[in-house]
């Protein structure tokens, strides 16, 4: 089961999925991210996601595409070594800033040199 919380903060929206992000839960995540399409800056906190497969990664990439089409941007906060390794191995961290803390990810939002 995947739970998703959305918090609106000054300057960005925090999307925090909690639970496995995989083929079984990806539709719920896609829907949540699609609901944020009008937001300028989105920070996705993956710290509560113990597992993510290619479906979850694809949903993240789709959210990035939509945000950038609307002149926005996305950053990811994640302190889980297994997910950081996945994001690095797939090259995801070359298109989006991936930082260990929310604070670091917020600083990277909108900074073209942050990736």
Located regions from the model:
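Amphipathic alpha-helical interaction surfaces in cytosolic regulatory modules
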Residues: 23-96
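Residues within well-formed alpha-helices
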Residues: 16, 62, 66, 104-107
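General small-molecule cofactor/ligand-binding pocket signal
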Residues: 5-7, 77, 99
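A charged, well-structured terminal subsegment
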Residues: 100-115
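A generic structural signal for alpha->beta connector loops
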Residues: 1-3, 11, 71, 95-96
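Conserved catalytic submotifs in the C-terminal HATPase_c
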Residues: 9-11, 47, 103
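STAS-typified acidic loop motif
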Residues: 2-31
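Acidic/proline-rich low-complexity IDRs
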Residues: 1, 82-85, 108
């Amino acid at each position: 089961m995947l739970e998703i919380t959305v918090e609106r903060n000054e300057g960005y929206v925090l999307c925090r999925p909690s639970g496995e992000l995989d083929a079984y839960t990806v539709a719920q995540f896609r829907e949540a991210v699609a609901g944020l399409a009008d937001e300028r800056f989105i920070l996705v906190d993956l710290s509560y996601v113990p597992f993510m497969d290619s479906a979850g990664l694809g949903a993240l990439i789709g959210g990035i595409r939509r945000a950038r089409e609307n002149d926005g941007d996305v950053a990811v906060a994640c302190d889980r070594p297994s997910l950081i390794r996945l994001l690095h191995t797939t090259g995801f961290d070359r298109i989006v800033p991936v930082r260990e803390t929310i604070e670091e990810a917020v600083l990277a939002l909108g900074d073209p040199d942050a990736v």
